[in-house]
Every structure is written in structure tokens, then in C-alpha cells.
Curated annotation (Swiss-Prot):
Entry keyword annotation includes Transcription: no
Species the sequence originates in: Bacillus cereus (strain ATCC 14579 / DSM 31 / CCUG 7414 / JCM 2152 / NBRC 15305 / NCIMB 9373 / NCTC 2599 / NRRL B-3711)
PANTHER family xref list: GMP SYNTHASE [GLUTAMINE-HYDROLYZING] (PTHR11922:SF2), GMP SYNTHASE-RELATED (PTHR11922)
Keyword Nucleotide-binding part of the UniProt annotation: yes
Enzyme class: ligase
Stated name of the protein: GMP synthase [glutamine-hydrolyzing]
Reactions mediated catalytically: XMP + L-glutamine + ATP + H2O = GMP + L-glutamate + AMP + diphosphate + 2 H(+)
Amino acid sequence: MIILKKQHDTIIVLDFGSQYNQLIARRIREFGVYSELHPHTITAEEIKAMNPKGIIFSGGPNSVYGEGALHCDEKIFELGLPIFGICYGMQLMTQQFGGKVERANHREYGKAVLKVENESKLYANLPEEQVVWMSHGDLVTGLPEGFVVDATSESCPIAGMSNEAKNLYGVQFHPEVRHSEHGNDLIKNFVFGVCGCSEGWNMENFIEVELEKIRETVGDKKVLCALSGGVDSSVVAVLIHKAIGDQLTCIFVDHGLLRKGEAEGVMKTFSEGFHMNVIKVDARDRFMDKLKGVEDPEQKRKIIGNEFIYVFDDEASKLQGMDFLAQGTLYTDIVESGTATAQTIKSHHNVGGLPEDMQFKLIEPLNTLFKDEVRVLGSELGIPDEIVWRQPFPGPGLGIRVLGEITEEKLEIVRESDAILREEIIKAGLDREIWQYFTALPGMRSVGVMGDERTYDYTVGIRAVTSIDGMTADWARIPWDVLEKISVRIVNEVKHVNRIVYDVTSKPPATIEWE
């Protein structure tokens, strides 16, 4: 995003494989400063061209002295930019400047008490003792020349170090993790106190810049957008429509695997509310015919993905003069793939590969944003809360929440039970606290008694998790009285259900979805 980089101070984060690397960039953006995550292989020249105010080295699972250790372009240290090494990043800096890194006697994982020994700029106005989050198997045992010890812990004599003359800093713990009680303040001290950044990254500025960028890119040509009703595609559609109006056409495919009222809600919001040109395709019978008798989850995903492509292709071929395809690719998608997205699309991010003869120029206005930023953007654009805060929903829809073969009866059970769950969670005021919640049909039946009669009906599973980004998740502690209301309502209001179970498994070992 070239325009933004020129207008805003930027902090570059180099990725050395930490599970927390995205959190670092997100924390910095929360401060109102733009930040990007880049592979550790980026060159010093490439960084110089971005004109950042500072660099952060992330943590990682490797040992700096081990086979396959990840390194960076040594010329990065010659750029004269402030550098902040976190965990592996500190060890890499130590090795680079002639210090010593060794394996610890035991791996340290969890909370530790940090004692500040030297109040460098990194620890300005922070308490002398604070709880931090450790996750490492190696230690810095010898400081490089010119460095001093900033902080220690019981198991880590050099938990923080600095060479303030060269603006080089390192910590053995993870300030980006919320368990580090003053971690945000420490990162702020680096961003503002050391690098001298100014706030300026916000959604209002983003919208202004992105609207102009879309207009310049598209000109008088036309754009096609696959609208699912999910957060990402909804925000993309509204943003582009705000920029170019009727030059945008959306295709909404109703595959019959949507949640209760979802298809009607999409049309009402976008066709009537935003006055957008939306083509609705009723393809329920087409999808159900293809899924008949299929039980394997991967095969179901493949069939749904492929059929979506064929339906989209059929509709797109009826439209003339479509030059661009709008896609809701997020920054996390680019980071996790490790490569930038190609300029000409042959595969759609959300639905699988489009036919090879369908060539579009790609527009990805969200590809510098994280999910939480997309929600903020959606609110700024005036999209209703029920869409902006909509639960994450998989592309195959309810097709992977019905375990085994999909039938209309099973879909109806999941659709109705899920609607009750959502209604009660919202009533209880828990909808913003729980990251994701839904019902699933595991395909098992059990004996029950209803109205003095024996029943042999389906079991419905409830899944609710708390998470920051979906990479890890914990099962949500929904109050018992709320669970009871949900259970009673589902059993009484949804036909062919006589038992409710609650999934109390975290991710890992389980995934959030059941299929």
C-alpha cells in the first residue's frame, strides 16, 4: 500500500517463525502507527525503500546455533535504524554482535517476574518488577560488546539488554502477549520513545486513501464481487460501491447451506439498504444434488467449493465487460501464505480455483488489514452491527456443521438450533465476549423420554470459544443458566432433537469447527 507508507510512520516486523508474530504488528497498529510483517529473508535495500522508523525481530522456535537456524540480511544492522529483538530476535542480535547464546538447563514457559536493572528507554516509566510471559529454550549467557543488562528474572539472568548508543534493544520474554502485564507499554516505549513515531494510522484516513486508490485503479471500468454476506466480502463490496457506485456488480450465491434468515438479510442490507446491484442465484437444489450420499468432510468441502465456482462462472459469463474481481483477502491471508497475491486471478481466495479462462485484474482493498480492523472499517462505512460483528462462518457453510451426509432435515435442525443459540447469546450480552459460537449435528441419535413416550432422536452439539485471532482458542465459560435456557429451547422448539451436549475442548488439540 504505497500511498499509506508515504503518509504514515511505519514499523517493520521481521518474521522468524513465532506463533505471536502477527500480534506484534497488531499491537503497534492499535497504537495508531502502521506496521507490516515481512519474512526474515527481506533485504536491507527493500527495507530501506520502505523508509520505516524502526524494525522488530520476532521470536521463533529455532536455536540460533542450530542447523536450519533463520538469519537476516546482515546489512540490516548497518541501516542505522532502531532494532528491537524479541526472544529469538534478541538471541540473533546477540550472535550477530559477538555475544553468547546457549541452551537453558530447562525450557522456560509461562509467567515470570521481571526485575528491571537498568532503566533504558525501553523501560521508561515502567515498574521495577512486572509479570512477563516467557517461552524459550535458549538463553543469552554472554553480552555482546557495548550492551548492558536491562532486566533479569529468576531463571534468566539476561532477560533484557540494550546498546542505547546504537538504538539496539532485546528482551527474552514476549511483550506482545497479554500475559505480559506491561508489554504494551514496553512496545509503546520502543515505537514512540526510541523510534520517534507519531500516531496517524486510523480507519478514517484509510478509507480516504483507499477510495481514491480504487477510483484511480478502476477508472470507468467494471468490477465484479462475490458477496457472501460475511464480514470480509460485505466490507469490500460497500467500500468499492462507495468509490465507484454502479460500476460494481455483486453475485450472491445461495447454496442452501446458510444460516436462518441469512439470504434474506443479505439482499435486504445490500440491495435495498445500500442500493447495490446484487444478483441473487438460488442454487440450493444444484448443491444438494451434488452432495447426496457424500459423508467425507473433505469431499464435501471440495464439492461445495467446486460447485460454487461453476455457479459463479455461469453467472459471470452472462455479464459483459467485467475487468476486475474484488476479493476480501486480509493481511493474515497474505502473511500466512508467505507470498504476495498475484495480480491476475486464477483462484478465488474464499472459494477455491476459478476456471483458468476467467482472467480478472484483482482488487484487494483489505489486504493490509487484520480482522479486527476490518470490523472497525465496516462500522465506519455504516454497515449494520449484525453483519460487522457476524460470527466467522466457513465457506462450505452449514455443510460442515452437519457431520456425515447432508439432508434437508439435518440442515433444518442445525439452522434452527443455531438461531436459538445466537438469540440467547445476544440476549445474555455475551455476543461480543465470545469469539465464535454455533451448533453442530454430530450425526448420532440417543434414547430420550418426551411426553411419557420413548424417543430416539438427534443430539445437537454446542461449540463456543474465546480467542483473539482463531489460531488458538479456549472453550467459552457460558453461565449455566444461559446454557440451560439454550438447551431447553432447542429440545422444545426444534423437531427430532432430544439431547444437547457442550464442547469443552480447546484448540489445540481440537479445531474450532467439527469438520
